[in-house]
């Protein structure tokens, strides 16, 4: 969705152009879709759990118009630095999803726009971490010293310690293209 600072109004939920169609193509290939999100605005008192639920409900409604269904969404409401096991990049949300849905890390990918998403993928042992340049992605990639002038997608050489993504993708459609080309993704796309 389009990034809005501490999004709490369902009527402000707006998809990034092309995102729903890319998600639909992934679903058509048998991928299950999950959302894992840090929502420290709840702990900060900037939004409530009900606000978050209303936003997620609106997202589900919009996606349903494209025949896209999220299998589940998990969120961490805690502040950074509070030592919880669920806040990305910690793997707590992955562990919960893996246990409940029988996911396998080597058949799962994370697509995100923040370094914490990428580190979450590494800490969870996922097959790949894809940084999209939408939302915060452009600034995050530049903070890692990565060239963002490419078109489509760019596969990076392995990174010791998982400090950078496996793949940079211009947007979700480019990420979907890479996943489709892998032909190794089974039952679980995070």
Feature-to-residue mapping (PLM):
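Acidic beta-strand-to-loop metal/phosphate-binding motif
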Residues: 36-38, 110
């Amino acid at each position: 969705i389009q990034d809005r600072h501490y999004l709490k109004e369902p009527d402000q939920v707006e998809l990034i152009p092309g995102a729903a169609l890319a998600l639909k193509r992934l679903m058509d290939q048998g991928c299950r879709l999950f959302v894992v999100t840090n929502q420290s605005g709840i702990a900060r008192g900037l939004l409530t759990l009900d606000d978050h639920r209303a936003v997620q409900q609106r997202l589900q409604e919009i996606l349903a118009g494209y025949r896209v269904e999220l299998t589940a969404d998990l969120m961490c409401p805690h502040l950074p630095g509070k030592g919880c096991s669920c806040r990305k990049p910690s793997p707590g949300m992955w562990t919960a999803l893996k246990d409940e849905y029988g996911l396998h890390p080597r058949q799962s990918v994370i697509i995100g726009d923040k370094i914490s998403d990428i580190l979450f993928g590494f800490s969870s042992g996922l097959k790949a971490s894809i940084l999209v340049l939408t939302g915060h992605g452009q600034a995050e990639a530049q903070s890692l010293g990565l060239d963002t002038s490419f078109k489509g997608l760019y596969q990076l050489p392995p990174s010791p310690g998982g400090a950078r993504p496996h793949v940079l993708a211009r947007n979700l459609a480019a990420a979907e293209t890479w996943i489709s080309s892998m032909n190794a993704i089974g039952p679980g796309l995070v």
